[in-house]
Amino acid sequence: MQRNARPLELARWEYLFDGGSRERVIQYLASYQNEDGGFGNGLEPDFWLPDSSAIATWSACQQLIEVNATKDEKIVRNLVNYLLLSYNREAELWLTVTPEHNLYPHAPHWQYTKDVQSKWMYNPSVELAAYLIHWSNEESEANKLGWQVIEKALTYLQQAEDMGFHEINNYQKAANLLQDKMGDSKKVLAKIHQLAERAMNKLPDTWGKSYGATPLDLIHNKEDLLYHQYRNLVEENIVYLHKTITTEGVWNPSWDWGDDQLNFAVAKQQWIGIIAINNQQKLQIFQ
């Protein structure tokens, strides 16, 4: 981390594991924030769009929650304003990918095509809505918009037969933030639980051979109902994490950019720092 990580990931690592300062995390995160309050500039290493986007802003939200940022901090106030201004009233969510993504180096999965939103649906809108509610006053415009999106996202959730694990993660994060405020949280959590169980790759021999959800991608703590159901698989997943550490003490991403290996070499190095933080957090929780 000291040698190869971006300053932001190094600051996060030091904050999470070495008693480092939250102010340093916010300082480096702010360098990715644009004047409109949103985030871009390659914060999410798989697309290098400098302009603000829903996904880069979602990534910033997660990191701000990590350091317990409050609604009164400037970086959060500006972010909330961006979400209010960038909400797409026709689609009734924040567009996940836009045509501008195609203008800059990006992974194939961030390619914009017509009707691509039907693939992403409420990734990351349901989670962005939860952050809006979390960082706004009741009866404010931001709070009302957040609940408006949550209501539609929950209707979609109950109708879903299956769901990609990233979108499930969005719902998990939203439910974790809002469960004491949601009217029928038990029904919501039960549906998320059902979809997570379906999305989980339960075949250890296939982990890492294709891009998919291992148990630790969907089970986040020992209080999770799925943990008690799949404890043996979680323990196998921990063993797998230890086995896949490189000689440099980190993990490589399980995906690439297809034909664009030159730019992926840069993104890969940035992802290694992010994956190291994510996996170290998992190991701390379950060991």
Go through the PLM ranges and name each one:
Residues 1-287:
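Preference for long, amphipathic alpha-helical scaffolds in soluble/luminal domains
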